[in-house]
């Protein structure tokens, strides 16, 4: 992984003596890859790349976005029309969001069709299902943030769905909306979920997912 010139340098040796960099490097680069692996086994990694792009572009937009019902739409227009390369950053964010969902769906189908969910990888599959739910939740909450007509009515419909659940349905709707109707509290909740709660959740479950894949390796052919 590292050239001889790098490994012979005093700086590298100093770090290697303390962190065992060479052992970590050897473990990463010497992992066995089965011969049946093809491009479709890269779909999970592509999903991760899309998430990283989402995180970077989303973080950039938080400097200008205002999560209020009076300023949200105007702040999005400001990003698109006034901020340098703002239109590009938001466009990349939107397109990578669609790509992330698509790659996630294809990844789920690939794992299912190749039997990657079977013993001993049941927990890997379960964390993957949780990641899929979080990914879709990202899309639902992010869709509302521009607070335009499409976003507003999408929130109104989505947040009203739990009302069909017996006993606790109305309480769930009120919890999602922050009140009886869609308004500022709803936007605040969706913004908090989209920019804080879901990123932490997806990071934790991604780490678990990758550690289990690393431990168990890639599943064999059918």
Swiss-Prot record:
Residues reported to bind heme b 1: 107, 209
Q: Where in the cell is it found?
A: Cellular thylakoid membrane
Q: Which HAMAP family match?
A: Cytb6_f_cytb6 (MF_00633)
Q: Which family does it belong to?
A: Belongs to the cytochrome b family. PetB subfamily.
How is the protein disposed in the membrane? Multi-pass membrane protein
GO CC, alphabetical: plasma membrane-derived thylakoid membrane
* NCBIfam families per UniProt: PRK03735.1 (NF002990)
Q: What does this protein do?
A: Component of the cytochrome b6-f complex, which mediates electron transfer between photosystem II (PSII) and photosystem I (PSI), cyclic electron flow around PSI, and state transitions.
Example GO biological process: respiratory electron transport chain
Q: Which CDD domains match?
A: Cytochrome_b_N
Q: What remark does the entry add?
A: Heme 1 (or BH or b566) is high-potential and absorbs at about 566 nm, and heme 2 (or BL or b562) is low-potential and absorbs at about 562 nm.
Q: What are the UniProt keywords, alphabetically?
A: Electron transport, Heme, Iron, Membrane, Metal-binding, Photosynthesis, Thylakoid, Transmembrane, Transmembrane helix, Transport
The UniProt entry lists the main location of this chain as membrane
Q: Which residues does the record give as heme c binding sites?
A: 42
User: Which protein is depicted?
Assistant: Cytochrome b6
- Cofactor(s) the record lists: heme b; heme c
| Protein residues bound to heme b 2 | 93, 194
